[in-house]
């Protein structure tokens, strides 16, 4: 990847809107900065097509695919390393998300990562922190999306607390205002439902404290525009959202009796169906977290994705930082992890891979899998690889998408033991697993012993390992282990040939 590419792009497949931004990277005295040069927004309302049994209907999928085809045209000339597309809550919970994503990736022309709630929160904070003036105090960032709401407390560019709750403007509007009707009782019930969710985190968050509250993304900005344009804020407050401003907006909405009859300055048509749900959640935020005023920012998830992408281009990949933290936390034997990782990569480099970018990515995943393959020893030596895989699959891992975590976890799970357990797993990359298992087998002594020249290759749908016969004769345990390894691969109908050479 070229350092500081002139243009980067991020795509946010939100539960309410799909958004694309293109940013230009510029070097300043304070470091690399990203300036937005283009943006597209499509009010897809994907969450509105989610049924009670968590299935996306065809109409919402079609809206999403159409939007992504238009985005794809704008991104047609971009290098894959300069684009990152992420999907959030609706595609986290939809049972047929895979069906949607297959067509979505074809429409966009780039991979789409489904990210976990806390990873979404981390990226939201990164975007917000880069778009507001520097401050020495702590900030609370609240991002009300279509299907979830993220709460982050951070200082400077570092998040301290991150949570994602399953309340959003689309899902809340569908649950409490399906026909757009609003009255005192229904609004109160919607507020209480949101409050019950926020109460889970409110005590801990208030104990941590903050000096500034910021609302990011569409709901906060839409509410701010409405209270500002219609003079709902108290005198002297020219921008942002005040408690009094929200209450006056609520009164106007209840008086109108239906969101479609509400006549206010700055009320955009695509915001009407989700206004009541978003307002009730923001009211609950103010009440449960004792907030009196919220400033707003345009910087949110998509800007955070751009800065994360920029970090990767400058070799500051958050995933590497996360793996390093896990190694410290779980007391990983660094020498052994390094040994296995280096050997696995050496084997992988002998295999055919025509795509240089794919090769570079796979080398990173092999290194991460080697670094994490023994973290399960912190639980038990027995079946440690299963414990390691469970942690890698389920822990919050900043920088990793769900797909990333699944890839690493599959390698970690498969590096030892029977291969049959992976037969039904879609996330297994068998050539990488071949390299990792062989490296782990040869590094069993956990010491820097000299290994002979070992050649590996793929042939006839399987693998071949070639090593000197003289060396094998002096290492009977390795000889036995290789025969067992070959038998294990044969069980899943993958040829595995060990050739002892005379050189």
Protein language model regions, located:
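N-terminal glycine-rich anion-binding loops that anchor highly charged ligand groups
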Residues: 32-48
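Cationic, histidine-enriched alpha-helical/coil surfaces that engage anionic ligands
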Residues: 82
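C-terminal amphipathic alpha-helical interaction region
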Residues: 497-503
């Amino acid at each position: 990847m070229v350092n500081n590419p002139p243009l980067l792009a991020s795509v946010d497949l939100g539960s309410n809107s799909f958004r694309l931004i293109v940013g230009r990277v510029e070097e300043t005295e304070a470091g690399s900065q990203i300036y937005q040069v283009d943006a597209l927004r499509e009010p897809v309302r994907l969450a509105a097509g989610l049924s009670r049994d968590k299935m996306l209907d065809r109409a919402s999928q079609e809206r999403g695919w159409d939007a992504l085809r238009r985005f794809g045209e704008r991104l047609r000339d971009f290098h894959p390393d300069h684009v990152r597309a992420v999907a959030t809550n609706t595609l986290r919970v939809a049972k047929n998300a895979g069906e949607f994503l297959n067509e979505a990736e074809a429409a966009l022309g780039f991979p789409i990562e489904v990210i976990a709630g806390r990873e979404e929160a981390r990226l939201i904070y990164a975007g917000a922190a880069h778009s507001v003036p520097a401050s020495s105090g702590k900030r609370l960032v609240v991002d009300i999306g279509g299907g979830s709401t993220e709460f982050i407390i951070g200082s400077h560019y570092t998040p301290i607390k991150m949570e994602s709750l399953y309340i959003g403007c689309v899902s809340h509007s569908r649950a409490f205002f399906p026909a757009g009707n609003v009255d005192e009782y229904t609004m109160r019930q919607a507020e209480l439902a949101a409050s019950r969710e926020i109460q889970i985190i409110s005590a801990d968050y208030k104990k941590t404290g903050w000096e500034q509250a910021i609302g990011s993304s569409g709901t906060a900005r839409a509410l701010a525009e409405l209270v500002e344009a219609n003079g709902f804020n108290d005198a002297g407050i020219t921008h942002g959202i005040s408690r009094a401003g929200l209450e006056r907006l609520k009164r106007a909405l209840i008086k109108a009796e239906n969101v479609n009859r509400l006549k206010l300055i700055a009320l955009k048509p695509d915001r009407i169906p989700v206004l009541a749900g978003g307002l009730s959640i923001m009211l609950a935020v103010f009440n449960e977290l004792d907030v009196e005023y919220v400033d707003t920012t345009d910087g949110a998830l998509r800007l955070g994705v751009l800065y994360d992408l920029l970090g990767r281009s400058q070799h500051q990949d958050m995933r590497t930082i996360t793996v390093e933290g896990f190694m410290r936390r779980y007391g990983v034997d660094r020498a052994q992890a390094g040994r296995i990782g280096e050997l696995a990569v050496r084997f992988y480099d002998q295999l055919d891979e025509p795509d240089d970018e794919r090769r570079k990515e796979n080398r990173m995943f092999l290194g991460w899998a080697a670094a994490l393959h023994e973290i399960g020893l912190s639980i038990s030596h027995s079946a440690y690889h299963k414990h390691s895989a469970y942690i890698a699959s389920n822990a919050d891992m900043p920088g990793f998408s769900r797909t990333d975590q699944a890839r690493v976890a599959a390698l970690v799970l498969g590096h030892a033991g029977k291969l049959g357990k992976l037969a039904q797993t879609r996330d297994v990359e068998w050539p990488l697993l071949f390299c990792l298992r062989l490296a782990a087998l040869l590094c069993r002594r956990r010491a820097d012993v000299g290994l002979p020249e070992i050649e590996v290759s793929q042939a006839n749908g399987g693998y071949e390992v070639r090593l000197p016969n003289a060396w094998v004769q002096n290492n009977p345990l390795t000889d036995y282990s290789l025969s067992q390894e070959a038998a294990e691969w044969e069980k899943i109908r993958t040829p595995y040939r060990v050739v002892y050479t005379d050189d």
